[in-house]
């Protein structure tokens, strides 16, 4: 029986017989029994090829029964359930004054509850109600001609229907309390908010003196708004006449309304941080006088209001924009509803705006101001001792809100009431200007306690910090570009940040993990080399591209510090590597080889938490740590032959060494003419191939790192289950069952998820703490142990070993095809993109040639049985590996580098045999064409289905 049992809080309207009252104590059991019988009848009908879909509603519960297809139909169309439930309760959207006047009186405090069957998240309904309440308050204030927002007196207006006329409500809706509307009605009101008008038929006698203004037009108060009183009592503060033009008093609030959101892709392009200046009338949309909207009004709002909600079952916060007042209430009000809203919502834009409001408000409180001011993030990052941030959750660095993800934003908002800023001293201007000046004796010393300072110094500090925090309204948005400048000093003659919105700020000199995490916010998941080059390019080139002359000392000072450190570390690595291979002069370290073979090629003596990477990937703190431990750093090479696999760049210092590696360096004339086109073309071609191969090697490194992390997670998960071999981690089921599996030991700031979602830098950080990672299963759940296959139940651990053996076989055969007496790593991606370049014979008939990671255990066994017959023949030389051997054939002149496309393989997706490069596929042009159309990057462990975990293996395995 498929039982939803969603309880609804809507009071019944007498839809059921009186005998189903609560006086009948066993009515729930009888109803459940009858529904079960109904489900049995549906099962019997399904055996006769009949399909049934049934919705049963009783009191506060809804039941869905039927055949399998019928239940799928109803579950996919939950609006049918909610419509039927409302139909049983009576016609929707009726005027409560005519139908149920007593219920209106009774619900004035909290209102009637809404049927939850039409909405999954109660906190989203709460947000919609607050937004509709804001709309009504603004329209009522406009009708009064007030410059401030006045709460609408629902009790009096509903008691005297002739007092207020409401026009423009959606068809079928009557004016009542927002708490009495259902979610669809709330969304309809928000969609038509620009058409709604309030008109007072007769003036209120006490409305002028008893209305309470909640939000002034010159800014939002930092005091939490709290609960709102619907009655007409409370004194309204006087509004200065200069705060608002006379022409803007009556109709200027019309733009302070709500509408449904734009599509998700358009939302991402919008600015994602709230305005960090004091909320002026322009920020609330109240400063621009608007005429009475007619046809033009509907046209202006057509883009915002044309989108319908995706469905009543989804979280409606994805489909609405919350006003700044609502967001301010979320941040400052201590309400369980807002706490539930923060936990349930996944809208990153709303969360970022809330965190931005939180930081700006707390910073203003620290300055003693009564309005929000923008936080000078760059100044705090460069001079962290000036401002202390208290209460931020552990392992979350203080950064711009646009650099946080959803989990960190939620954690910050959960601790929002305990977060505070403490101003310790003024910012050291030498950090931002690079000038050396005599320190003013009136300024606060860093080491002196705050109580030793005079009131004048404190006042000067506040004015300086507040003045630096303010900026021109034209450039005040500070919205979501990670390097956006929000603290451009409006009163200062020198800009301290560039205007380019696309620059990522990575100039943090302290040893905090901010600079490393900023690289994760760069577009895409770059490998470690890309991250290093990207950071260097952005800091050294991008930041100074549009900078003024007086700004350049700031960037030069930071670059002057980090560049020599990088050169020293690079020289250190090259010297230690040359010593390990027996060469006296420094040799460039093949970082990719060390990352691809961590067991045979590694480095000892590095500081704790630092792995071998290019020096460009390190910040100042880690570079200094490496130099401090320079005497203990040593390169260990267990298998020297790995260094010669796939190497194209010979060591030009020694001809004998180059020859021993199987290369013949190009014989250039001693005096070459710079204008020789042949020489220039050969040099260009060589540089192009080097860049192309470097890109391929970085991709291979990233794939290798992901495979290693995946193997690590599978191994740790198997250990948590008490099994001695790896087990495929059920990521989706672990995510859907929070708390069932606890993962400990991950680096700070790295959440547990699929390795394919990490960049190379985070993958390296995970591998660096592999010994500390631990899985703990706290409670079982469905899918904890995958269902075993019939044939593979007893042989799951063997697949890893067989796969490595097939890899070694293919590498050996590929080396023989190149005319070398050693194994060579097979370029599976290049062969897949050019299936005619290499012909593989001797494989079993039903097995195409591809990456061994994609084979199942049966195919791996068949290949190993036929290993003596496997042969590889190179027909057309692969371009990036053209220099790997001396006897390779010269490629055709018109051959071009194949374009590669990367697609990730989803879980359980089988790789089609169209990527085969065997003789059968080379003779079939259709299969070759399909192979060129679909280019896949195989993630090896994601296609492994470890099952039968409680079955003993026949013997010990050396994993």
Curated annotation (Swiss-Prot):
UniProt KW DNA-binding keyword: yes
GO cellular component: cytosol; nucleoplasm; nucleus
Main location: nucleus
Keyword Ion transport carried by entry: no
Motif (Nuclear localization signal): 898-905
Bridged cysteine pairs (disulfide): none
Compositional bias annotation for Basic and acidic residues: 96-106
Subcellular location: Nucleus
Chain intervals with Low complexity compositional bias: 910-923
One BP term from GO: regulation of DNA-templated transcription
Cross-link (Glycyl lysine isopeptide (Lys-Gly) (interchain with G-Cter in SUMO2)): 27, 94, 184, 212, 225, 238, 271, 294, 308, 337, 436, 439, 443, 567, 579, 588, 622, 638, 684, 724, 732, 772, 774, 787, 829, 889, 893
Keywords: Developmental protein, DNA-binding, Isopeptide bond, Nucleus, Phosphoprotein, Repeat, Transcription, Transcription regulation, Ubl conjugation, Williams-Beuren syndrome
Highest taxon in the source lineage: Eukaryota
Tissues in which the UniProt entry reports expression: Highly expressed in adult skeletal muscle, heart, fibroblast, bone and fetal tissues. Expressed at lower levels in all other tissues tested.
Positions of GTF2I-like repeats: 119-213, 342-436, 556-650, 696-790, 793-887
GO molecular function: DNA-binding transcription factor activity; DNA-binding transcription factor activity, RNA polymerase II-specific; DNA-binding transcription repressor activity, RNA polymerase II-specific; RNA polymerase II cis-regulatory region sequence-specific DNA binding
Residues recorded as bearing Phosphoserine in the entry: 448
Family: Belongs to the TFII-I family.
Domain statement: The N-terminal half may have an activating activity.
Disorder: GTF2IRD1 is located in the Williams-Beuren syndrome (WBS) critical region. WBS results from a hemizygous deletion of several genes on chromosome 7q11.23, thought to arise as a consequence of unequal crossing over between highly homologous low-copy repeat sequences flanking the deleted region. Haploinsufficiency of GTF2IRD1 may be the cause of certain cardiovascular and musculo-skeletal abnormalities observed in the disease.
PANTHER family per UniProt: GENERAL TRANSCRIPTION FACTOR II-I REPEAT DOMAIN-CONTAINING PROTEIN 1
Protein name in the entry: General transcription factor II-I repeat domain-containing protein 1
């Amino acid at each position: 029986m498929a039982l939803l049992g969603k309880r609804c809080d809507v009071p019944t309207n007498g839809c059921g017989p009186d005998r189903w009252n609560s006086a009948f104590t066993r009515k729930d059991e009888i109803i459940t029994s009858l529904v079960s019988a109904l489900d049995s009848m549906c099962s019997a009908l399904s055996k006769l090829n009949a399909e049934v879909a049934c919705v049963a509603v009783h009191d506060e519960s809804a039941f869905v029964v039927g055949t399998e297809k019928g239940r799928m139909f109803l579950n996919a169309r939950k609006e049918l359930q909610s419509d039927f439930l409302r139909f049983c309760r009576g016609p929707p959207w009726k005027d409560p004054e005519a139908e149920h006047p007593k219920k209106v009186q009774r619900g004035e405090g909290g209102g009637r509850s809404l049927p939850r069957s039409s909405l999954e998240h109660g906190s989203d309904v709460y947000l919609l109600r607050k937004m509709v309440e804001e709309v009504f308050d603004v329209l009522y204030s406009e009708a009064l001609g007030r410059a401030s927002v006045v709460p609408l007196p629902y009790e009096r207006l509903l008691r005297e229907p002739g007092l207020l006329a409401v026009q423009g409500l959606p068809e079928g809706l009557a004016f009542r309390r927002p708490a009495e509307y259902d979610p669809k009605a709330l969304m309809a009101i928000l969609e038509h908010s620009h058409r709604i008008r309030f008109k007072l038929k007769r003036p209120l006698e006490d409305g002028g003196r008893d209305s309470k203004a909640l939000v002034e037009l010159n800014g939002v108060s930092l005091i939490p708004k709290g609960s709102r009183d619907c009655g007409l009592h409370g004194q309204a503060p006087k509004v200065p006449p200069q705060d608002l033009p006379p022409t803007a008093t009556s109709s200027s609030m019309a733009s302070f309304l709500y509408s449904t959101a734009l599509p998700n892709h358009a939302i991402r392009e919008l600015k994602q941080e709230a305005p960090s200046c004091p909320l002026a009338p322009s920020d609330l949309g109240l400063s621009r006088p608007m005429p009475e909207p007619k046809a033009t009004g509907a046209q202006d709002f057509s883009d915002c209001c044309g989108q319908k909600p995706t469905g009543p079952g989804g979280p409606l916060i994805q489909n609405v924009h919350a006003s700044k007042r609502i967001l301010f209430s979320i941040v400052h009000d201590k309400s369980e509803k807002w706490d539930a809203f923060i936990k349930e919502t996944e809208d990153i834009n709303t969360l970022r705006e809330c965190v931005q409001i939180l930081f700006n408000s707390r910073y203003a409180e620290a300055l003693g101001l009564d309005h929000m001011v923008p936080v000078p993030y760059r100044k705090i990052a460069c001079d962290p001792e000036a401002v202390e941030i208290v209460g931020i959750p552990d392992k979350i660095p203080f950064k711009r809100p646009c650099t946080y993800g959803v989990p960190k934003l939620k954690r910050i908002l959960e601790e929002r009431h305990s977060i505070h800023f403490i101003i310790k001293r003024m910012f050291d201007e030498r950090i931002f200007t690079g000038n050396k000046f005599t320190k003013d004796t009136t300024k606060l010393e860093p080491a002196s306690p705050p109580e030793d300072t005079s009131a004048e110094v404190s006042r000067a500090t506040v004015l300086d910090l507040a003045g630096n925090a303010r900026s021109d309204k034209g450039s005040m948005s500070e919205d979501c570009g990670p390097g956006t400048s929000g603290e451009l000093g409006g009163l200062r003659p020198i800009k301290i940040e560039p205007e380019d919105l696309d620059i990522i700020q990575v100039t943090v000199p302290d040893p905090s993990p901010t600079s490393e995490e900023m690289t994760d916010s760069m577009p895409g998941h770059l490998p470690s080399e890309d991250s290093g080059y990207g950071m260097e390019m952005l800091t050294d080139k991008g930041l100074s591209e549009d900078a003024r002359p007086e700004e350049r000392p700031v960037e030069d000072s930071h670059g002057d510090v980090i560049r020599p450190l990088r050169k020293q570390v690079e020289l250190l690595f090259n010297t230690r590597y040359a010593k390990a291979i027996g060469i006296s002069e420094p040799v460039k370290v093949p970082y990719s080889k060390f990352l691809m073979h961590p067991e045979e090629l590694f480095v000892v003596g590095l500081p704790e938490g630092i792995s071998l990477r290019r020096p460009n990937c390190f910040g100042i703190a880690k570079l200094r740590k490496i130099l401090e431990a320079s005497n203990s750093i040593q390169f260990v090479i267990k298998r020297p032959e790995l260094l010669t696999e796939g190497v194209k760049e010979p060591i030009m210092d020694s001809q004998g060494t180059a020859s021993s590696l199987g290369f013949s360096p190009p014989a250039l004339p001693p005096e070459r003419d710079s204008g020789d086109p042949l020489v220039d073309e050969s040099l260009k071609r060589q540089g192009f191939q080097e860049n192309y191969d470097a890109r391929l090697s970085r991709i291979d490194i990233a794939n290798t790192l992901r495979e290693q992390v995946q193997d690590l997670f599978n191994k740790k998960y198997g250990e948590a289950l008490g099994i001695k071999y790896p087990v495929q981690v059920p990521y989706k089921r672990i995510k859907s069952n929070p708390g069932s599996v606890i993962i400990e030991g991950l680096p700070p700031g790295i959440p547990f998820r699929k390795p394919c979602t990490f960049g190379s830098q985070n993958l390296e950080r995970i591998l660096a703490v592999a010994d500390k990672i631990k899985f703990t299963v706290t409670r079982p759940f469905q899918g904890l142990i995958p269902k075993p296959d019939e044939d593979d139940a007893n042989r799951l651990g063997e697949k890893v070993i067989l796969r490595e053996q097939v890899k070694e076989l293919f590498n050996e055969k590929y080396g023989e095809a190149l005319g070398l007496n050693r194994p060579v790593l097979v370029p599976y991606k290049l062969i897949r993109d050019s299936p005619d370049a290499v012909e593989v014979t001797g494989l079993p008939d039903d097995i195409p040639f591809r990456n061994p990671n994609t084979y199942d255990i049966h195919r791996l066994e068949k290949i190993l049985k036929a290993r003596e017959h496997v042969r590889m023949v190179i027909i057309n030389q692969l371009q990036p590996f053209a220099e790997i051997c001396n006897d390779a054939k010269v490629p055709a002149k018109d051959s071009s580098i194949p374009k590669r496309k990367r697609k990730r393989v989803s879980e359980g997706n089988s790789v089609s045999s169209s990527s085969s490069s065997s003789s059968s596929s080379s003779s079939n042009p259709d299969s070759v064409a399909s192979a060129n159309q679909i280019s896949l990057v195989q993630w090896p462990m994601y296609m492994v289905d470890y099952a039968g975990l409680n079955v003993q293996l026949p013997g010990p395995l050396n994993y």
